[in-house]
A protein has these predicted regions:
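Long amphipathic alpha-helical segments
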Residues: 1-53
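Short beta->alpha linker loops
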Residues: 12, 96, 121, 148-149, ...
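Short glycine-enriched loops at secondary-structure junctions
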Residues: 14, 66-69, 149-150
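Short glycine-/small-residue-rich flexible loop motifs, especially phosphate/cofactor-binding loops
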Residues: 21, 79, 154
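Short, acidic/small-residue loops that bind anionic groups at enzyme active sites
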Residues: 27, 139-143
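Conserved mid-sequence domains
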Residues: 36-135, 142
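Short, structured coil segments at secondary-structure junctions
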Residues: 85, 139, 158-161
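Peripheral docking tails and interdomain loops at the edges
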Residues: 144-187
């Protein structure tokens, strides 16, 4: 059975890792099992990322996870969703300090930034990291934030005028809306 890529991501990969996370947190799954599943799926997602070709002129989107956030599947899946929406997604991986994220945004001349926030309890650094990113990239840069840990930073997300996306469909809708609006401004 062949599924379209977005359906595969939304109906297989995302629920799979949600369930793996639940099992790990409840102690029913060993860390080694979670890591093994992660290696297999990460490799598959990387292959999918490399297989997609996007025009050089497509708007650039930096995708990463902030410092302290090591779970990268939300970011990888977001990068794939963005590529399929016509963006040149530039994936920089997990655990990046705000200064490095800002450097990537500026160096790559990104049109937008996507941050994946994993499940993280009591992450005292994250709100400050998000504020630093917003100050450095300016008020006009769209920042999309998603992932299981986004509930812990909803107030900060509102303060920095970030777009909180609750799932891949909402993320793709936001990306496509942004592209339409940018295109309308040019004409």
């Amino acid at each position: 059975v062949e599924l379209p890529r977005q359906a595969f991501l939304q109906k297989v990969i995302v629920p799979l890792f949600t369930r793996i996370g639940e099992l790990w947190r409840s102690g029913k799954l060993k860390i080694v099992n979670e890591h093994m599943a992660s290696v297999v799926v990460r490799s598959m997602l990387w292959d999918m990322l490399r297989a997609l070709e996007i025009a050089e002129t497509a708007p650039r989107l930096v995708v990463a996870t902030p410092v302290g956030h090591w779970h990268e599947f939300g970011a990888l899946v977001s990068a794939l969703a963005a590529l399929e929406s016509g963006w040149r997604a530039l994936y920089f991986g997990p655990n990046l300090p705000s200064e490095e994220i800002v450097y990537a945004v500026k160096k790559c001349d990104a049109a937008a930034l996507t941050l994946s926030i994993g499940h993280c309890l009591n992450d005292k650094r994250l709100p400050l990291e998000l504020l630093k990113i917003r100050r450095a990239v300016g008020r006009r840069m769209p920042i999309f934030i998603g992932g299981g840990g986004v509930v812990s930073v909803r107030q900060t997300a509102a303060e920095i005028n970030a777009v909180v996306v609750d799932d891949l469909t909402a993320f793709r809708d936001q990306l496509e809306r942004f592209m339409r609006e940018a295109s309308e401004k040019q004409h």
